[in-house]
Amino acid sequence: MDKTSRRDLLKLASLAGIGAGLARSQGSSKSMAGVSFKPNGTVRIGVIGTGGRGGSLIENFSAVEGVQITALCDTVKDKVLKQQAWLDKAGKASHPIALFHSDDHAFENLVKRDDVDLVVVSTPWVWHTRMAVAAMKQGKHVAVEVPAARTIDECWELVNTSEATQRHCIQLENCCYGYNEMMVLNMVRAGLFGELTHGGAAYNHDLRSILFSAEGEGEWRRFEHLNRDGNLYPTHGLGPVAHYMDVNRGDRFDTLVSMSSISASLQQYRKEKIPAGDPRQKEVYKEGDFNVSLIRTVKGRVIELEHNVSSPQPYDRINLIAGTKGIFRDYPPRIYFDGARREDFETLDRYKEKYEHPLWKKVGELAKELGGHGGMDFVMAYRLIQCMKEGTPPDIDVYDAAAWSAPGPLSEASVANGSAPQKFPDFTRGKWQTRQPV
């Protein structure tokens, strides 16, 4: 593996987004669709990226019974030592913990260790695919933060590597494990919405202060806005809707069209908040403030997908699902079914006793105590470890990681070509037609 520096990779990241690509499968020996983990009573985890998000994942995974954090890696030594100290104080370090922090490629030593079953990747996006592939090639399952890939070539690289190594690549889409999302999934499964026709998904989140921060995500995330224009972060809203619609398990994303607004809000924020003469004043942002994409599935369903992290606004993932019998929309959560006495939404309250998801009934109180986006982070961690310990397939596999990440590069290609339609590859190689729903 070449020793490309982090600075060089971040520069390349700014130029790589348009690579919607014409990548094709290289073939494989066996699909990973429906493949179970080998049952394992103790799951040993190595974490790459121990900053803010990585630290939160360490806290949530280590709270699951049967988990051992055996290795930590970050380019900043103090971040590794901070997490080691936390594990020790929390009584989670009764076993040796290997530490890696020499340079940008220290992770290559972590993934080679024989005391790691699962590698968790929580780093800048440009490293996600590279690190996930390295882990799988060393015989490790990998759980990678979102988006798992930034180009269609990277999506195929994840799929091909997972199939070739027979190791799972799980995208850590925590929003699939939110209370409302899992409850609504139960209601969808019970047929309350009838035949599904439409979904709505978004990542609308005012990140201006984070993007211009001198630390954390501010050190790299703003650079994604310099030479990319599309939906840079599609999975938080899209993942739950994909589960509602059985995408990759009875239906499949088929076509996407996308358009972006002008880029104005980051410039306005910079003008008001950043001192004159600061090097950031010279940055030219390509990413539009608001991107909207439409996805059509093979079955003819339509999903509206939004992205806006640059404007003053309340947080909103939309989380909408509609069918022939009713509609649900989140933020705030409200629901309407055909035949209601009045033409107005109602709250979810009277449905909770019957349709609350079993996972939330089982670990919801502990999840809320730990926090982590309202508890969804712990439910996600608990469920993945449950699958590994019991020997069942993961809820979110490499085909989901690829399909849910693909709107990023496909939206860029559509925007760059006058909102021209873009076709989704079939990452499952036809298996979507026979797979069982989550």
UniProtKB/Swiss-Prot annotation:
**Which EC class heads this enzyme's classification?**
hydrolase
Question: Binding residues for substrate, per the UniProt record?
Answer: Y203, R221, Y233, P234, T235, H236, Y315
Question: Might you give the EC number(s) for this enzyme?
Answer: 3.2.1.-
Which UniProt keywords are given for this protein, alphabetically ordered? Answer: Glycosidase, Hydrolase, NAD, Signal
This entry's Gene Ontology molecular function terms read: hydrolase activity, acting on glycosyl bonds; nucleotide binding
Q: Which cofactor does it need?
A: NAD(+)
Q: How is it modified after translation?
A: Predicted to be exported by the Tat system. The position of the signal peptide cleavage has not been experimentally proven.
Region of interest (Disordered), residue spans:
408-438
| Signal sequence segment | 1-33
How many cofactors are bound and how?
Binds 1 NAD(+) per subunit. The NAD(+) cannot dissociate.
Q: Does the keyword NAD apply?
A: yes
Q: Which InterPro entries match?
A: Gfo/Idh/MocA-like_OxRdtase_N (IPR000683), Gfo/Idh/MocA_oxidrdct_glycsds (IPR050463), Glyco_hydro_109_C (IPR049303), NAD(P)-bd_dom_sf (IPR036291), TAT_signal (IPR006311), TAT_signal_bac_arc (IPR019546)
Query: Which annotated residues bind NAD(+)?
Result: G52, R53, D74, W125, V126, W127, H128, E145, V146, N174, Y233
Q: Which family does it belong to?
A: Belongs to the Gfo/Idh/MocA family. Glycosyl hydrolase 109 subfamily.
Summary of the function given for this chain in its UniProt record: Glycosidase.
What is the recorded name of this protein?
Glycosyl hydrolase family 109 protein
Please name the source species: Solibacter usitatus (strain Ellin6076)
